[in-house]
Amino acid sequence: MQAPIGASRPQRVKQYIPSKPHKWGYKIRCLNSDDYLLHFEIYGFKEGAPSDAGATVDTVLRITAAYQQKQHVLYTDSWFTSPALLDALAQRGIRLCGSVRSNRKGMPAVAKEEVLALNRGEWLQRQKGDATVAVWRDQRCMWLLYNHCSPGESASLERWNDFGRKVSVGCPRAIRDYFYRARSVDVLSQLHYAYCCELTLETSVQVC
């Protein structure tokens, strides 16, 4: 997860993130489990020259260093997920499941025509080595890269239809796992912003 810590003083490592409630601040990259923050790293400090895998992969390997060779599953969003990250984590005993951008280098080939032909609740999967990419159609197509479970396993999710009712929609098991685990990131993000708001309200009170 990426989250900014609001800051007003000028600093070299401050970032501008227009999509976040706090536009200016220190960008931190977080590792969390079940709503609890395990480790974080402030973005902007140089850690030497990046490896061939790239700076993003290097960052993930640093913040997961204490959890290697324990067969944990790491869930990531499309900012971090890539075939290079999946391979690097697999070598260190960590499995990966994350949303991914369709144009990432090294992705298994998926024909555009096949993707466009999908209806809601349908999916297709392609494998390349240990990596599996799933393209699942809900209201729109979602791309997922994973190696933590078998590609043949299916499941279902409750989704809203056009009439405002919940319906059961079929999906690969990896998609269900990702949606379930992504909730902890959302909760941690909400707590983070609520805590920042409390600090702002508290420090704005003047005692006369």
Model-predicted regions and their roles:
Residues Q2-C208:
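Acidic, contiguous segments within the catalytic cores of piggyBac-derived transposases
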